[in-house]
Regions:
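Acidic (Asp/Glu-rich) sequence patches and key acidic residues
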Residues: 1-280
Length: 280
């Protein structure tokens, strides 16, 4: 079962909805893309809200608005932020809003319960299934939260591939056995807290390190410069917010050289322990 929200309503002027979304996105630092039949609001690298519209045949010339979001693997923090965005639209531009929230958070906005009673058990079940698959085929590999239309990383037997890193069966199994669901959710969900804390920025960097980065000089292309810069900015922001949070310091230093940027992390920042070097 996927966790998320679907919603619908009507409006008199779809352009007002577009402007309202753009205004809210600017206030929150989200990215927005719009086209003729809809738009997408990107709240984080693995989480977005889609909206679409079609004209309603009536004398008043109204528009039907539909939308949705899938909240995994982004995490409970994303779900909360998406719910707030959807609620705000229902209070302003979209009339007669109806929604269905698979987590019931919109009906009972208790974030800690959302995380503990919905997202963590869901993650445990996904990991349990992944490990059972590896037990049946120890030489196999499981891609978890991975878009099947996306490239396939080089195979490493006995591992689980995720957007924020590769993990061995042993590493995941040990934590599942001792019930360390909070540790697992903090590591595998990109956005696990209500706001943008240090771990959120670190996980955004990890997602781009593992999934998007070519580890190429920034002057090779505009894409390399953008990706390298985003990763470095996120890691430096994370260190400013929590100097004790482990970061991928070795990868950071490598990218600083590739980006021709001076080292900006404190020397005593702890190294994030990873079984495999970042990069698919």
């Amino acid at each position: 079962m996927k966790l998320g929200i679907v919603f619908q309503g009507e409006c008199r002027n779809k352009d007002n909805v577009v402007r309202a979304v753009q205004r809210m996105a600017k206030e929150k630092g989200y990215r927005v893309g719009a086209w003729k039949e809809g738009m997408r609001v990107v709240l984080c690298p693995t989480g977005y809200v889609d909206l679409g519209w079609v004209p309603v045949r009536s004398f008043f010339g109204r528009w039907k608005i539909t939308g949705s979001c899938v909240s995994v693997p982004a995490g409970p923090g994303f779900h909360r932020a998406a719910a707030e965005l959807i609620q705000a639209l229902g209070e302003k531009e979209i009339k007669d809003m109806e929604w269905k929230d698979s987590t019931n958070y919109l009906e009972d906005p208790d974030f800690e319960a959302l995380r503990r009673e919905t997202f963590e058990p869901w993650l445990a079940e996904q990991l349990k299934q992944a490990l059972e698959e590896l037990d049946r085929d120890p030489e196999g590999e499981v891609r978890l939260f991975w878009d099947e239309d996306q490239y396939w990383p080089e195979k490493v037997p006995g591992t689980v591939v995720t957007p924020v890193g590769r993990f061995s069966r042993q590493w995941l199994g040990q934590r599942l056995e001792r019930g360390a669901l909070r540790e697992l959710s903090e590591r595998l969900f990109l956005w696990n807290e209500p706001g943008h804390d240090a771990r959120f920025h670190r996980n955004c960097a990890l997602k781009r390190l593992w999934e998007d980065c070519y580890f190429a000089p920034s002057d090779r292309s505009g894409e390399d410069a953008q990706i390298n810069g985003l990763i470095l900015d996120e890691l430096e922001k994370s260190a400013q917010m929590d100097p004790e949070l482990p970061l991928p310091v070795e990868s950071y230093r490598e990218l600083c050289i590739l980006d021709d940027r001076g080292f900006g992390l404190p020397e005593d920042i702890p190294e994030l322990e990873e079984e495999f070097a970042p990069g698919y």
